[in-house]
Amino acid sequence: MKIKQAIDKIPGGLMLVPLFLGAFCNTFTPGAGKFLGSFSNGLITGTIPILAVWFFCMGASIELKATGSMLKKSGVLVVTKLATAWVVAMIAGAFLPGDGIQNGLLAGISVLALVAAMDMTNGGLYAALMNQYGSKEEAGAFVLMSLESGPLMTMVILGASGIATFEPQLFVGAVLPFLIGFTLGNLDPDLRKLFGNSVQTLIPFFAFALGNTINLSVILQTGFAGIFLGVLVIIVTGIPLILADKFIGGGNGTAGIAASSSAGAAVATPLLIANMAPEFAPVAQQATALVATSVIVTSVLVPIITALWAKRFSPKHA
């Protein structure tokens, strides 16, 4: 059976298929983890430890060596995306209630959902698109995008906007596995290869555990809001990214469009933030479902828009 091949045909499938399987299990057999115990319970409830290993391996996979132009392009896109998410957090924090929108088609939208969906780029999607529609240097710019992975930047944005307060040790705890992996990976290429190969392997495991924190009814209830959030991510982050790419990064805007997506890893952010800041616990489940939908929407729309933009503004694709 070509199971992996079928999963790869689904946008973000490696993350989303196990996520929905986990949600299915949690909806219809919510006590399975406690009933089975032992290793099975670890797989079902082990989101945090599995993610800790994934962050370590992600850090180990990043090679420090990069050209100046590559770092410039990557830095421009990362800073622009994070700055945009911060502005959104400031505006949303002033108008949205702390527990998010409770009624109507946009029920479930919260500051946490908005920031989590907007502050992290799908680096794999970006690299694939720029390999096709950009230059090798532009494709290689995804190197710094890996630094967005995990809850650290979301914590910084929520803290800087005054929406949440985190103890200093929580920032250290959030980034330490990544930094240790990054250090080891750059000290020894063999370790980088060893741990780097595990990044993709671990995704289905933390996705399944994460899915076991979600009820399918929440996903159904937030369907329209999730689609709206995905489109909003492309518009709100895409426009500043295009402008930054053109006027600072020296590109034609294609890289900006390619970076205007929600990363699959962002689906885990609401739960991680709620784990450190309990005031977000009431909105974490809905935010997770919304970000998951946003990942699907942006994974489908961003390649289409990028292709159209490149055809219009890139000479070699005109």
Swiss-Prot record:
The record ties this protein, via Pfam families, to: KdgT
Localization of this protein: Cell inner membrane
Q: Which GO terms describe its molecular function?
A: 2-keto-3-deoxygluconate:proton symporter activity
Q: Which UniProt keywords apply?
A: Cell inner membrane, Cell membrane, Membrane, Sugar transport, Symport, Transmembrane, Transmembrane helix, Transport
Q: Read off the InterPro entries from this record.
A: 2keto-3dGluconate_permease (IPR004684), 2keto-3dGluconate_permease_sub (IPR018395)
Residue intervals passing through the bilayer: 10-30, 42-62, 76-96, 105-125, 139-159, 162-182, 199-219, 224-244, 254-274, 289-309
Q: How does it sit in the membrane?
A: Multi-pass membrane protein
Q: Which reaction does it catalyse?
A: 2-dehydro-3-deoxy-D-gluconate(in) + H(+)(in) = 2-dehydro-3-deoxy-D-gluconate(out) + H(+)(out)
Q: Which domain of life is it from?
A: Bacteria
Q: Name one GO cellular component term.
A: plasma membrane
Keyword Manganese, does the record have it? Answer: no
Family from the record: Belongs to the KdgT transporter family.
Q: Which HAMAP family match?
A: KdgT (MF_00070)
What is the protein's known function? Catalyzes the proton-dependent uptake of 2-keto-3-deoxygluconate (KDG) into the cell.
Please name the NCBIfam families in this protein's record. Answer: kdgT
Entry protein name: 2-keto-3-deoxygluconate permease
| Species of provenance | Pectobacterium atrosepticum (strain SCRI 1043 / ATCC BAA-672)
